């Protein structure tokens, strides 16, 4: 079976800074640095990722590219007396990811739209860029779309600020432990991990039966019987 176009796009984005795609990314970053921090783009940069997250080339759906500075928080240095250790200027990083920060900034820029999802598109030594998919809940094309009309209800307003997007749920720990405990997949993975650790233990029967190749060659002369 022939591979689709999206397969080849995804393959290039596995190593985006190598080969011909790396030269293209270099030219893109040079251009993106000169642009505003929040910019509406005509088409998504990663079409495969955008389509997987719900993007559709139709009225009522837009994509905004957001630039976020890398690193932790920059806090103002206090002018009152205290030790430099207790000034609280360095070493403070927000608990939320830069991707979630990009979604929040896009939501503030377009308050009448609903953030659907976002994805990574590039970075340099100072900034990271994300593209955020936004949907207009009042557009007739969105209201008539059975896959997107769930955003038309009022309860989805301000999703990034309430941790309801994919990046927000990851920040809340719903994808790691709290939201997965009790499911069959979580229990199966936990039991499989316990079995692997039990086999690797030095006192287990399976570990005693395993002989390294060099020991087998030295003492058994290559005889496996």
Curated annotation (Swiss-Prot):
Protein name listed in UniProt: Large ribosomal subunit protein eL15
Keyword set, alphabetical order: Ribonucleoprotein, Ribosomal protein
Keyword Membrane found: no
A single GO molecular function term of this UniProt record: RNA binding
GO cellular component, one term: cytosolic large ribosomal subunit
Family the entry assigns: Belongs to the eukaryotic ribosomal protein eL15 family.
InterPro entries, alphabetized: Rbsml_eL15_core_dom_sf, Ribosomal_eL15, Ribosomal_eL15_arc, Ribosomal_eL15_CS, Ribosomal_uL23/eL15/eS24_sf
Chain segments carrying region Disordered: 159-180
Superkingdom, natural source: Archaea
Regions of compositional bias (Basic residues) in chain numbering: 169-180
GO biological process: cytoplasmic translation
Cited Pfam families: Ribosomal_L15e
């Amino acid at each position: 079976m022939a591979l689709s176009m999206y397969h080849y796009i995804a393959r290039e984005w596995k190593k985006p800074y190598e080969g011909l795609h790396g030269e293209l990314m270099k030219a893109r970053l040079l251009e993106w640095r000169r642009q505003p921090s929040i910019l509406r783009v005509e088409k998504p940069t990663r079409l495969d990722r955008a389509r997987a997250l719900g993007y559709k080339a139709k009225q009522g759906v837009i994509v905004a590219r957001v630039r976020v500075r890398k690193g932790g928080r920059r806090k103002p240095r206090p002018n009152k007396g205290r030790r430099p250790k207790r000034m609280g200027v360095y070493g403070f990083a927000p608990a939320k990811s830069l991707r979630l920060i990009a979604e929040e900034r896009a939501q503030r820029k377009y308050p009448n739209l609903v953030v659907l999802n976002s994805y990574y598109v590039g970075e340099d030594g100072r900034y990271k860029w994300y593209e955020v998919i936004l949907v207009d809940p009042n557009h007739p094309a969105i209201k008539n779309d059975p896959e997107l009309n769930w955003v038309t209800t009022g309860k989805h307003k301000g999703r990034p600020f309430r941790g309801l997007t994919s990046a927000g749920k990851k920040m809340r720990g719903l994808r790691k432990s709290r939201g997965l405990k009790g499911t069959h997949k979580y229990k199966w993975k936990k039991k499989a991990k316990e079995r692997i650790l039990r086999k690797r233990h030095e006192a287990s029967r399976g570990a005693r039966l395993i002989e390294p190749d060099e020991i087998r060659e030295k003492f058994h002369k290559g005889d496996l019987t």
